Amino acid sequence: MAAKDVKFGNDARVKMLAGVNVLADAVKVTLGPKGRNVVLDKSFGAPTITKDGVSVAREIELEDKFENMGAQMVKEVASKANDAAGDGTTTATVLAQAIVNEGLKAVAAGMNPMDLKRGIDKAVAAVVTELKALSKPCETSKEIEQVGTISANSDSIVGQLIAQAMEKVGKEGVITVEDGTGLEDELDVVEGMQFDRGYLSPYFINKPETATVELDSPFILLVDKKISNIRELLPVLEAVAKAGKPLLIIAEDVEGEALATLVVNTMRGIVKVAAVKAPGFGDRRKAMLQDIAILTAGTVISEEIGMELEKATLEDLGQAKRVVINKDNTTIIDGIGDEAQIKGRVAQIRQQIEESTSDYDKEKLQERVAKLAGGVAVIKVGAATEVEMKEKKDRVEDALHATRAAVEEGIVAGGGVALIRAASKAAASLQGDNEEQNVGIKLALRAMESPLRQIVANAGEEASVVASAVKNGEGNFGYNAGTEQYGDMIAMGILDPTKVTRSALQFAASIAGLMITTEAMVTELPKDDKLDAAAAMGGMGGMGGMM
């Protein structure tokens, strides 16, 4: 086992604080509308330019192992805030730095760290309660746009795209971010349920100009097995032909004579048919077939539940207003499924999301919810260079997470104002069990001014003057660093999602509390490469007699 280096008490805390400050100082320059960029060197390719706090934090690794421990703990704050709310990483880092700096000063002055931590925890709990009271729901498209704009570092076009996407696919819909092909940002919306399976034969195409199959008011046959024998399909085909409507077959596969017969019938115009493979694999395929069945008011023909394809009737078939199929995707628009059943299915999948421990499974389940609940929107990010594309894509993803958080828990005044108002309301009733807890409460409440001070400092203004003016104001009164004006933050469109502000504060206080109560630090001693080399050479002394 390698030898260890141990530091105690003040020696340990000084080293840890140095690491905290290096990381936080690099991250906090990105905060606010006038935050600066940070350039990150990559081992290959062009450097990355970013204003995303968590991206900066992830890159930092310090040479001194004790300092690095401090830096890694603050990195954890940024990562946790990012995982919980998708934004607020810089705010969380600034708060953690402020609480640690104030807390360690108090410890150095002889205060009991455990009582300080209890005081900090009391202050944070009270402020979180006040934040929830200050929060107002984020419902209008304008508010969603404002939240998106702020989170994308005041890029109003991104805010507009996100608001439009949410309007089109609903609050539950899937919105993804992809690389665009031009210089402009674009929004691409797929309404209805889309899955990644195309037509099984190009002979089904009835719109040659777009190379797609379009079926109006089709019946939809859902089969949980391979179809290779046409005899199994004949009763359904005859019934559909009599009804005079097109038919979409979704099965595990359609092959051999069954596929050939369908193609011939389609080309002769006897019955309009298209066949696609069912989406997914294994159990997920069964679940997705069931989703389509509920969406289209059909039944999955499955031998597992004793149903046979030959005995299927028109009542077993689903229906939709329109189906569009290209070589890669199938889109079912306006299925006739019962609204209550669809909502029940969505609730059931949501329950599975809650219980799932795998991120991959959660993502796939979330996609299923979106396909049932609304649709899919793709924001295509345009940029002149690859470096700009990466930076912009990061910002768009941040903005998307922030708007989801705003819809979930509501919004509060931005620009650090909500924390100051919540802190001043909480201060009136907060009382610790002893004087040292009171010190913890006061230092935590004082640290809550730090995001506002940092935003102002990054804008090149005097932080103390602005902080004093904002503290003397009421309600949503604050300072807009972008325009350098005072006023009502919500009226000016400077909003923060409550969840982002709350998560940033809770994670910052949690890690900061652990740091303040640290009394010893242990790390491996660095290996001396010279000694290792000498030891290796020493083993060769007996070679002199070989001549």
UniProtKB/Swiss-Prot annotation:
E.C. number: 5.6.1.7
Reaction equations catalysed: ATP + H2O + a folded polypeptide = ADP + phosphate + an unfolded polypeptide
Main location: cytoplasm
Annotated GO biological process: protein refolding
A UniProt-annotated Pfam family: Cpn60_TCP1
SUPFAM superfamilies: GroEL apical domain-like, GroEL equatorial domain-like, GroEL-intermediate domain like
Listed GO CC annotations: cytoplasm
One example GO MF annotation: isomerase activity
Keyword field: ATP-binding, Chaperone, Cytoplasm, Isomerase, Nucleotide-binding
Localization in the cell: Cytoplasm
Gene3D superfamilies (UniProt xref): GroEL, GroEL-like equatorial domain, TCP-1-like chaperonin intermediate domain
Binding-site list for ATP: 30-33, 51, 87-91, 415, 496
Protein purpose: Together with its co-chaperonin GroES, plays an essential role in assisting protein folding. The GroEL-GroES system forms a nano-cage that allows encapsulation of the non-native substrate proteins and provides a physical environment optimized to promote and accelerate protein folding.
Assembly and oligomerization: Forms a cylinder of 14 subunits composed of two heptameric rings stacked back-to-back. Interacts with the co-chaperonin GroES.
Family: Belongs to the chaperonin (HSP60) family.
Protein name listed in UniProt: Chaperonin GroEL
Originating species: Mannheimia succiniciproducens (strain KCTC 0769BP / MBEL55E)
